[in-house]
């Protein structure tokens, strides 16, 4: 099974929408890989530079209502082709969250107090996810282990590598 985790990128803002994740002008690209350089291009966040800050990151930690806006699957694909396989937030737009699972990626919802704990660990945080146990381990200025909930069907989708792989295996 695929491993989930990596170095964390902190995006300290609520309501990051799919237009900020991947601008609409790039939706006509013919392959997922063609989306890669445009990740978070329109995100306005003090001092954030996607070309500099995304390199080597596998996890995004953010605030509430992540992935709101249009329901484009491209917003998940651009994370996939940039090797980001986990997004951790207080909440997600429903369709974005399901698109993550459908593509075999993790959208982990945590209470605000746990998000605050993660933000408090400093800039150099590494996340490891134990999908079977539904826990994540964050190592930064200290080490914390946080439990999360994931329903069985969505867990099966993620374990299979997404909806298509799950359907091939089960139908």
Enumerate the language-model features and the residues they cover.
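N-terminal, positively charged, Ser/Thr/Ala/Gly-biased leader segments
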Residues: 1-24, 165-170
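Feature captures the catalytic cores and cofactor-binding loops of soluble hydro-lyases/lyases
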Residues: 3, 22, 28-133
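Conserved phosphate/anionic-ligand binding catalytic regions in large, soluble enzymes, centered on
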Residues: 16, 67-73, 159-167
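Alpha-helical scaffold segments in soluble metabolic enzymes
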Residues: 20, 38, 99, 156, ...
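Acidic, glycine-rich flexible loop/linker segments
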Residues: 104-171
């Amino acid at each position: 099974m695929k491993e989930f985790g990596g170095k964390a990128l902190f995006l300290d803002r609520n309501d990051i929408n799919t237009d900020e994740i991947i601008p609409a002008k790039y939706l006509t690209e013919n392959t997922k890989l063609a989306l890669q350089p445009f990740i978070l291009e329109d995100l306005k966040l003090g001092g954030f530079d996607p070309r500099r800050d995304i390199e080597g990151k596998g996890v995004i930690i953010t605030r509430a209502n992540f992935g709101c806006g249009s329901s484009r699957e491209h917003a998940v694909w651009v994370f996939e082709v940039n090797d980001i396989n986990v997004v951790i937030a207080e909440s997600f737009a429903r369709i974005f969250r399901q698109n993550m699972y459908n593509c075999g990626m993790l959208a982990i919802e945590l209470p605000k107090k746990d998000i605050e704990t993660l933000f408090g660990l400093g800039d150099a945080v590494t996340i490891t996810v134990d999908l079977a146990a539904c826990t994540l381990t964050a190592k930064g200025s200290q080490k914390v282990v946080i439990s999360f909930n994931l329903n069985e069907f969505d867990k099966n989708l993620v374990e299979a590598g997404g909806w298509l792989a799950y359907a091939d295996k089960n139908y």
